[in-house]
Amino acid sequence: EMMDLAIERTDHIHARVGSPQAAQVPDPRIGKGLGWTKRFEVWWDRIIEARAAEGRPFLTINPEFGPPPYQAINPHTEEPLADIWEICLWMSNRFRTRWADL
């Protein structure tokens, strides 16, 4: 019910994938991160379908993943575990492919 209300009121998707343990997953392309990505995509699909059904001409989406402290780092080297720019491009391309027919 709460998600239904949120979906009804959403007109922008800030497409960062998080989990109960972190504001963003270390890498949304693999492993548990991909699992969370797929879960978020179900919600995002519902938002996009709802706006399309209303006849809205567009919906804004930004695939933004932040640097540390949002981004997971190697505790020994303090280096990021993934390339944020590559993740954002991957997410953007995934959106374009997923929703190309809308």
Task: List each model region and its residues.
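Histidine-acidic metal/acid-base catalytic patches
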Residues: 1-102
